[in-house]
């Protein structure tokens, strides 16, 4: 019996390489890796800590800014709308993980920061997260990781140049 196995976009592109530029195949490979890793991280965060990836990401941003961040700054850093962020912040304030105060420089803006409870819980999650990521890239040598970091920095600069209009 011939079973149809669904393919990811990268595999489809490889089947007819004449139909795709190498840059497209590269983008699809990056997307496949990101989707695979992000899905596993989401699953593990939910199973181990009962939290979502957006909650983890928000707490990570605030852990890097002990003085706190405005909702506007948080939404820029996380690349989400203020509306998406507001409900999550409200839930974390209600559970005691975040504190909210009025900005000293702009009375219209609210600044949120991790509480002691929030910071302790985030750091426990971050430790596990780091271990998981290490496990997922565990078959790469130190040299391969360094080379990928170098190449991805160049890819980011190239994409940034194109996005920001430096090239057409």
Model-derived segments and their meaning:
Residues 23, 73, 105-107:
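Short, solvent-exposed coil/turn segments
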Residues 47, 64, 80, 99, ...:
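Conserved amphipathic alpha-helical interaction elements at protein-protein interfaces in regulatory
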Residues 1-49, 168:
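N-terminal leader segment of winged-helix/HTH proteins
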Residues 35, 39-81, 95, 164-168:
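N-terminal helix-turn-helix DNA-binding core of bacterial DNA-binding proteins
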Residues 23, 27-45, 122-141, 145-159:
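Hydrophobic alpha-helical core bundles mediating ligand binding, dimerization, or RNAP-core interactions
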Residues 2-6, 12-14, 90-150:
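Charged, amphipathic alpha-helical coiled-coil/dimerization segments
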